[in-house]
Amino acid sequence: MVFISETSDDGSNGGDPTKNPQEEEEENLPPIPQGIPDELIESTVLLIRRCHYPTLSLLSKTFRRVISSSELYKSRFILNLTDSVLYALIGFSPYNTTNLYILNCNIPRNISLHLREIKSLPPLNHGSAVVTIGYHMYVIGGHNRLHQPTSNVSIIDLRFHTSCSLPRMQRTRVYAAAGVIDGRIYVIGGCVKRNDHWIEVFDIENRIWSSVPHHRYCNGSSLRGEGFVTSVVMQNKIYILDSLFGFAYEPRHGTLQSLGFETQFMFLWRDPCCVIEGLLYCIDPMCVLGHAIVVYDPNELIWRRVKGAYILPKFCYYQCKMANFGGKLAILGCSNSSQRGLKDVWFVEIELENRQSGEIWGKVDSLAIVLRSVKSPSIDLFRSVTF
């Protein structure tokens, strides 16, 4: 009987009798890469919702590096893969400081919405003015912990919830008006005495504050130099509301115009308010036009009611805040809880429809209790950021 071996004279192991075929096969495999290329990680991370980035950053240093790169956010913007996130400044008695909370609505519908305090950030000054540019939030002035007005300015990187200090303003300010026009931050008032530093402008690129000494006050201007109730940016002007009057500051011409009660604009302008697609939305508790939500068209100079079968929670309208949430109207407000001794913070998301007739209709897209507390919360700010 003859036995035929399947092993040739060369040997399938390369002629090395000390190696078996399995070891030889493993040696011939291509080398395993030591790490995943950044380009591959970025192309994958781009498709993932930003609310998951904090978890992804824990996987490795490479993931953290990619998620922290500005190139990732530029790519998200170019590919229209940005997310809108809501932030709120909320304080509790005695209201000396406020904390920043995040409300992420880009989650599956089966998960409850919840305001989450960002504990990596220090408490922020009560009465500070806040503006956002991209993923940066600028916190300007306000009362410090000793309840004294401050000129401090800080910037928050909303990608990673970190903050750092910026150069101080030339004056201390509380409840100042602030707005971004032509890439520059204008800060108005918030201080009792009016002088050449009453309006300051911040150069974002060079990080330099400058006063605007040559602003001209138009007839009827009655600014008392106190803190303001609210302000919005519309048609390249900063509209300012105090307890008695309204004003419009136009940086390009350096004019500050008074808006008297006789003007149509002042008829229903209240806080809370926000601007969506060039229109000013407000809550009118008296429902003068038949609905609680009204809208002002600065081109037609007319107020209209926002129609629709929407029902708002029974909260104190004057203590609410509104925000432009990706073209939708977002409202954050407080009410007494069904549980005795507790306070509820409600979130309302209203989808807006601009019909051909010029009418605007609203439909509640989301309604939820997002925070419950034994203390009475004070909502200083409600702002949407998209990046």
Curated annotation (Swiss-Prot):
Residues 31-78 form the F-box domain. Transmembrane segments: none annotated. Coiled coil: none annotated. The keyword Iron does not apply. Kelch repeats lie at residues 136-183, 184-231. InterPro entries: F-box/kelch-repeat_ARATH, F-box_dom, Kelch-typ_b-propeller, Kelch_1. LRR repeats lie at residues 105-128, 196-219. Residues 1-34 are annotated as: Disordered. Keywords: Kelch repeat, Leucine-rich repeat, Repeat. This is F-box/LRR-repeat/kelch-repeat protein At2g29770.
